[in-house]
């Protein structure tokens, strides 16, 4: 046997032993480790782990998020918006939900959102629909009765877009007076007005059999927790939106 064949057999023997060693690393061992969460990032947009075969899977439930700056996520990246983080929280807890379809713009009042819905060509119905609207009605001193009338009109549109009962969520209006932007304003007056609008929202949800979640109290923590506000000193940071997402998941889905 020449030297080349001896070296070749030696290499093969070492390789075989290494591959069959009980200490060799198995991918499933890594991915099951709670401290190893790279899949949380790589699977964010797809809503699944990269080691899952989704080629033959059924499409996950659809999600339509309606609102204003608080839904579009003014001042944060798209993946930090509360609807996107809500999907992440759901997926992490084993409930697959598709990435959100968002109809929202900074500055929108109820009738702006209503007009946008009227002008949108919807091609399907949705499994989950959220509504977070009203802060700009309050900020611009619009009558609360106008707000209530618009809510009824919005619900008519939403009912035509939902797949089933129990799928619509009403979210309370955050208290922007607790942000640095509201520091030199009458915070008590702002809170009183926000509470009035939210009482109307909660009553509206109860009358129509809709789920309701309060994120206002989370927003009021911003007075003592500046990291809950983004760099514009007004809108929530991704951290606050994560707090919302967790609470919304527990109330709406879990």
Task: Go through each PLM region and give its residues.
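Conserved SGNH/GDSL esterase-like catalytic core that processes O-acyl groups on lipids
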Residues: 62-64, 70-153
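Catalytic His-Asp segment of secreted/periplasmic serine-dependent ester chemistry enzymes
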Residues: 175-254
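Alpha/beta-hydrolase-fold catalytic nucleophile elbow
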Residues: 132, 171-172
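Feature marks short, surface-exposed loop/turn motifs that line or immediately flank catalytic pockets
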Residues: 23, 109, 137-139, 174-177, ...
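A short helix->loop->beta-strand "cap" motif at the edges of active sites that frequently abuts
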Residues: 161-167
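Conserved beta-strand segments of alpha/beta enzyme cores
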Residues: 99-101, 167, 209-211
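Alpha-helical scaffolding segments of alpha/beta enzyme cores, especially the outer helices
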Residues: 146-149, 153-157, 196-203
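N-terminal secretory targeting modules
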Residues: 1-66, 71-77, 91-97, 224, ...
């Amino acid at each position: 046997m020449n030297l080349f064949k001896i070296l070749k057999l030696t290499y093969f023997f070492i390789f075989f032993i290494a591959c069959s060693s009980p200490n060799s690393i198995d991918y499933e061992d890594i991915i099951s480790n709670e401290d190893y969460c790279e899949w949380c990032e790589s699977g964010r947009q797809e809503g699944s782990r990269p080691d899952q075969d989704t080629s033959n899977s059924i499409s996950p439930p659809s999600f339509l998020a309606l609102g204003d700056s608080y839904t579009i996520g003014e001042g944060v990246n798209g993946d930090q918006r509360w609807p996107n983080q809500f999907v992440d929280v759901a997926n992490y807890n084993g409930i697959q939900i598709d990435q959100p379809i968002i109809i929202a713009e900074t500055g929108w009042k109820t009738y702006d959102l209503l007009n946008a819905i009227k002008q949108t060509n919807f091609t399907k119905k949705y499994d989950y629909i959220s509504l977070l609207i009203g802060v700009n009605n309050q900020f611009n001193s619009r009558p609360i009765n106008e707000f209530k009338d618009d809510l009824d009109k919005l619900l008519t549109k939403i009912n035509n877009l939902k797949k089933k009962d129990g799928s619509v969520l009403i979210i309370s209006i955050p208290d922007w007076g607790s942000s640095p932007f509201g520091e030199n304003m009458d915070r008590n007056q702002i809170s009183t007005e926000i509470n009035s609008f939210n009482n109307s929202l909660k009553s509206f949800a109860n009358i129509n059999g809709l789920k309701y979640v309060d994120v206002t109290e989370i927003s009021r923590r911003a007075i003592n927790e500046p990291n809950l506000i983004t760099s514009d000193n007004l809108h929530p940071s991704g951290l606050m939106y994560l707090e919302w997402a967790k609470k919304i998941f527990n109330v709406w889905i879990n």
